[in-house]
Structure formats: C-alpha cells, structure tokens
Amino acid sequence: MRVGVPKEIKNHEYRVGMTPASVAELVASGHEVFVETMAGMGIDFEDSAYEKVGATIVPTAADVFKNSDMIVKVKEPQPVEIAMLEPRHLLFTYLHLAADKPQAEGLMKSGATCIAYETVTSRSGALPLLKPMSEVAGRMSIQVGAHYLEKEQGGRGVLLGGVPGVAPAKVAILGGGVAGINAAQMATGQRADVTIYDINNDRLAELDMHFGSTIKTAFASKATIAQAVKEAELVIGAVLVPGAAAPKLVTRAMLKTMKRGSVLVDIAIDQGGCFETSRATTHDDPVYTIDGVIHYCVANMPGAVARTSAFALNNATLPFILKLANLGADAAMAEDPHLAAGLNVSGGKIRNEPVAEALELEFVPA
C-alpha cells in the first residue's frame, strides 16, 4: 500500500503521524511511504531521517494525498486537507467528530473511509489509541493549572502543594479514567489536596486502592460537583463518553460560586468540553476568563510536548497502521472488530452511532 504522512497544520501542532522508526517498519513490510517535506521537524526529525529508512519526500501535502492510498495524521483534517480527500482514500487519525459537524459533513462529502483513533477499542473495552494522549493531557493539565494559578498569570496566587504552615491548593478532578488518574498522579506528586469524582463506584474503589490516603474520592452527583468547584482552586475536566459529546458537568451558575482566580482545565474540549462555559482555544491564545475564573481549553494539549506525544502515539498506532496497510481497510476491519469500532465515516455515511446522535445525523451501520 502507498501510505502518506502530511505535515500537521493545526495551530501549534508539532507532532507527526509517523516517526522514522514507524516508517521503517512499513517499508520493511513492502509498503511505499510518502512524507511531506518538513513533516517531522517539529520533533527534530529532518527529511533525511525519513529518506534513510526508505521514505519518499514530497514537496507539498497535495503530493502526499495524490500519491497515497492511506493518509496517517495526528489531528483532525483541516478544511484544506478535507478538500484533498477522495473516495479511494483511507484516513487514519484523531477525528473527534461529535463536536465538529462541519468536519463530519466534509468527510462525508469526500467519500473517504475515515477511521478515528479515539474510537478504536481493545478486548477489555479500553481505548488504546486515545490512552497515550490522555496520559499526556492528564499530566499536562496539572502543569498548566499550576502555572495559571500564579498571580502573574491572573490566577489566585496559590502554590499547589502549599508550604509548611500554609494549606495546599484543592484540586477537583472530574473523571477517574486515564486522563484523570494521570492528573491525580501529578497533583499528588506536588502535594496538592486532590479529590477525584466519578459516577462509577467500582472505579472509585479502584482509585482508592491505587492511591490510598493520598487522595479522596467522591461520587459525581450534581450536588457534589457543585460543592467541589466552589471549594477548589483548580478543576480538571477529564470525562469521556467514547465517540459522543462530553456531558456538561459544571454549569454557568456553578462557575459564579468559584473563587476569583481559580482555574478550569478542560481536557474534554476535543469532545465539546465538560464545562458549560468552555470553548476551544489554541496554544497561541490558550486562556480566557469568565466570572473571574480562568479557562484553559486548548484542543491539542499534547502538541505542546510534541516529542513525547509523537513517540507515545506511534507506539500505540503502529500495529494498526501495519494491519491496515497489509490487509486493506475492509479486510483489516473484518478481521479485527476492535479496529472496526474506529470506523466513523465511509461511503458518505456516518458509521459510528454516538457520533451520529451527537451531530443529529443519520447512523448507517457499515
């Protein structure tokens, strides 16, 4: 198969769909790989690194799309990229369609087969291609939150871990999944006062066993969330409904009760965000303030630590890329129902039911 890797063009997105090591694996399996010039420069891979392992460097994204059957990316295709997709193309990348109807309609119009990293499943029901970026975003959320709590950034002027004689900051983490647990690990490492909220009692028990006395856990009812945001200096939104839009857990009314200079970090912004006042921001302009509360809602948080993120993502995606290249999309999905769960769009139709429901579009099973 002919596989293409275009340079990412989303704002401040430095990751790359395939590292030279991943390209080497594809070439060794008999596939051709076309890489847009400078695609790897964001993580310090020059074109020569790709050429050494057998890739062909092409000057533009248009050349990548023209020469390739499968397009491997990191973030959702931008309008100029969607315009280059054809029915013959297989697109493998993060899509997050539930919060992006224009993208969904563009992909439907293209006729391409689009498999989303974030809805590929594993035998255990986990999301193996979302996990590495959730780990990164969870850990980053505490770094970011601590930064914006500084007075110079407009924050409350609070040190997460406090000092002897001064209480630490209270951190409320909404969601005890992969992002939430990684946020908790970072926050407890800084000696913050951490509580994780979730609606799954079994998960809360697991978290209690994992962290012991270093955190508190609580069931995520409306009342407990309202009290949590009122008391917390830092709130992390880390909820996920696979494929669907994130639930709005923190309302505008709750926001008005929060301390001035406190910080919200919405990891779920890719899926529409879990705060009523959330709107997607960029690394160029990452925060805004409503009712005295700082909102950080950057939709590609891991892009800020591109090298770590790119390697972590490639470790997870490579086996699936190889399977798709070796067998073709139809045969690969027929053989692997967990990969088939990643199919979001094909033949001009929405193939993922939660996505269709979120966008109020027709769901047509593959």
Feature annotation, model-predicted:
Residues 2, 8, 79-169, 298-300:
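Glycine/serine-rich phosphate-binding loop and adjoining beta1-alpha1 elements at the start
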Residues 2-106, 110:
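An N-terminal-biased, well-structured beta-alpha scaffold segment characteristic
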Residues 6-45, 152-240, 287:
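Glycine-rich phosphate/diphosphate-binding loop of Rossmann-like nucleotide-binding domains
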Residues 23, 47, 82, 104, ...:
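Generic hydrophobic/aromatic pocket-lining and core-packing "Φ" positions
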Residues 69, 75-76, 95-96, 221, ...:
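Short glycine-/small-residue-rich Rossmann-like dinucleotide-binding loops
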Residues 76, 136, 177-178:
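Residue-level detector of alpha-helix initiation sites
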Residues 118-159, 269, 274-366:
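Adenosine-phosphate binding glycine-rich loop
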Residues 209-291:
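Rossmann-like adenosine-cofactor binding region
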